[in-house]
Design a protein with these regions (language model features):
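Active-site-proximal cap/loop segments of hydrolase catalytic domains
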Residues: 1-143
Length: 143
């Protein structure tokens, strides 16, 4: 989703991006992470120059530019073992610094969740209702 929004932000009115894998190059360079080596086949191996160049072409963090982006909500989980919480944090910080629009760019870190979001039924419903409320607000839907 991050790559699509970077390439064609005009296609989206808003973006809701959950535990996004946006710092592809840096993450895939760390072969001590549990999923890295096994996912070379999916994302590419940055230690191979040709694959590194492919990865650099789509990596959302590396392709942020000074331009307008749609309203965006990014959620991450502090205990996520698949997408480390600092990856989307770094992405949001950089995007806030360089974007040229005044659209909201919200970043929410759930300190008790992992990759699947809140684990308790009521916590998950709370998060979903918050997200839907934000979505309706951004689309000017009266509820």
């Amino acid at each position: 989703l991050g790559a699509v929004v970077n390439q064609r932000p005009d296609l989206c009115r808003l973006v809701m991006n959950y535990v996004p894998f946006v710092d592809v190059i840096n993450t895939m360079l760390d072969d001590t992470l549990p999923l890295t080596v096994g996912e070379y086949i999916e994302w590419g191996n940055p230690n191979i120059e040709e694959e590194f160049n492919w990865m650099l072409a789509y990596s959302p963090y590396d392709n942020l530019e000074a331009k307008d982006y749609p309203s965006t909500l990014v959620r991450t989980g502090f205990n996520d073992s698949q997408v480390m919480y600092w990856e989307p944090a770094k992405y949001v910080a950089r995007k806030r610094r360089i974007k040229t629009d005044s659209n909201p760019l919200l970043f929410i870190t759930d300190l008790s969740s992992g990759h699947g979001g809140a684990s308790g039924r009521y916590d998950a419903m709370r998060d979903l209702s918050w997200d839907y409320t934000w979505l309706c607000d951004q689309l000017d839907v009266k509820i």
